[in-house]
């Protein structure tokens, strides 16, 4: 009986130890609060061969990331598509319309990643998904990131096909007018919140 009690007690200690370590490990990736004035989410499209840069002025991000805790890192960015700004009122109105983002029906674009690959001390790939205009596709997002104390800086870019997301219909399907590939860019600076 005493032997059985010792076995049960030992197993209980082991289980609680694993739970404690697991929880501590899962909480190790710090959360980051964005410095909005130093962060930017944008894109570069091509119209008749000329590059057209733009930014999204409103977005929210939930970022838990650390190079030494990639298995516990995750990113979710929600972008208000209505906030697009290409420095042209007429063009922005067109981009918001049903022909492109259809912001009335699809007010958010969402990037989410929970799997990360480290290529070098400061180079990574986020394996995630991008949702635009109600269409979700897998995407690999290469980026560089550095953590110094309670400061995070990251930047990266990736190309996506606008046609995969149904962006640009009717006359805008012509890739000689609007290029098929759009380069998504971002610069993020954040401060640790825990």
Predicted regions and their residues:
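Positively charged n-region of N-terminal signal peptides that target proteins for export
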Residues: 1-6
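Bacterial N-terminal signal peptides
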Residues: 8-22
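Low-complexity, acidic/polar, glycine-enriched regions of mature
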Residues: 24-194
